[in-house]
From Swiss-Prot:
Catalytic activity reported: adenosine(37) in tRNA1(Val) + S-adenosyl-L-methionine = N(6)-methyladenosine(37) in tRNA1(Val) + S-adenosyl-L-homocysteine + H(+)
Entry's localization field: Cytoplasm
Major location (coarse): cytoplasm
Native organism: Porphyromonas gingivalis (strain ATCC 33277 / DSM 20709 / CIP 103683 / JCM 12257 / NCTC 11834 / 2561)
Alphabetized GO MF terms: nucleic acid binding; tRNA (adenine-N6)-methyltransferase activity
Family of the protein in this entry: Belongs to the methyltransferase superfamily. tRNA (adenine-N(6)-)-methyltransferase family.
Reported function: Specifically methylates the adenine in position 37 of tRNA(1)(Val) (anticodon cmo5UAC).
Domain of life where this protein originates: Bacteria
One Gene Ontology term from the biological process aspect of the record: methylation
InterPro entries assigned to the protein according to its UniProt record, in alphabetical order: DNA_methylase_N6_adenine_CS, SAM-dependent_MTases_sf, Small_mtfrase_dom, tRNA_Adenine-N(6)_MTase, tRNA_adenine-N6_MeTrfase
Name the UniProt record assigns to this protein: tRNA1(Val) (adenine(37)-N6)-methyltransferase
Pfam families listed in its UniProt record: MTS
EC number: 2.1.1.223
Length: 255
């Protein structure tokens, strides 16, 4: 039976009672989001669907001057995230709200704040075959946060130079591009994630900026291979995640 405590280098995640546990998708997004070759550092971050608070805590660790807000529709998970944030070294910079990001009443919590960085590891199952556990259904099925509505809401909350970072199934990229164009966002970074070199990418990390202020250029694209060979990790994966994981890595250099 999996433990309810997942320990990172600088904070712990207590997952007790939470539908979605710590996983590779969340860790990758928390480590990847907000990287900017130009050196821009986000000051105000928003994690939509924060769950246990994992990504919010990762952002607080990476950006020591940033204030981070997490929003979670599941009240049990929201309380879990609050406890995890309160127990962390970053407690004075993290606020967790319980509610639906699509609900206009959340304006009372967000106010006029606009965010330099918005992140989300959204639910993505579209099948009508829902999990029997309502809490798990909210965490995993898109009906609670449709991708188009997420992008629409994020576009309203981004600052002019802000960035929206997502991790989604690779096969949703066409939808992402359509919805982004509808709400005047353009792609600035795309990273395909492969577990092994010969495997097709199942996930994509994507970053989007407001079209009105984005530099007119093609997005930076690359591929992240997690395991160049069975039992080993790539240097790129280690670079992203080593600041967080307490375990040591067996590294196999590629090339």
């Amino acid at each position: 039976m999996p433990t309810d405590i997942f320990s990172f280098k600088r904070f712990d995640i207590d997952q007790t009672g939470c539908a979605m546990r710590v996983g590779t998708d969340g860790v990758l997004l928390g480590a990847w989001a907000g990287e900017d070759p130009a050196g821009s550092i986000p000051q105000h971050c928003l994690d939509i669907g924060t769950g246990t608070g994992l990504i919010a805590l990762m952002l607080a660790q990476r950006f020591p001057q940033a204030r981070v807000q997490g929003i979670e529709i599941d009240p049990i998970a929201a309380e879990c995230a609050r406890a995890n944030a309160a127990a962390s070294p970053f407690s004075d910079r993290i606020v967790i709200a319980s509610g639906d990001i699509l609900d206009s009443s959340l304006e009372s919590l967000i106010g006029n704040q606009r965010f330099d960085l918005i992140v989300s590891n959204p639910p993505f199952f579209k099948s009508s075959l829902h999990a029997p556990d309502r809490q798990r259904t909210m965490a995993r099925h898109e009906e609670t946060l449709p991708l188009e509505k997420l992008i629409c809401r994020a576009s309203e909350l981004l600052s002019p130079q802000g960035r929206l970072a997502l991790i989604t199934p690779r096969d949703r990229l066409k939808d992402l591009r359509l919805y982004a164009a509808t709400y005047r966002l353009v792609s600035s970074r795309l990273t395909e994630v492969r577990t092994l070199p010969h495997k097709e990418p199942k996930r994509i990390l994507s970053e989007w900026r407001p079209a009105d202020t984005a530099i007119d250029r093609s997005p930076f694209t690359d591929t992240l291979i997690i395991h160049p060979a069975t039992g080993y990790y790539s240097p790129e994966y280690v670079r992203l995640t080593e600041p967080f994981y307490t375990t040591s890595f067996r590294i196999l250099a590629v090339g």
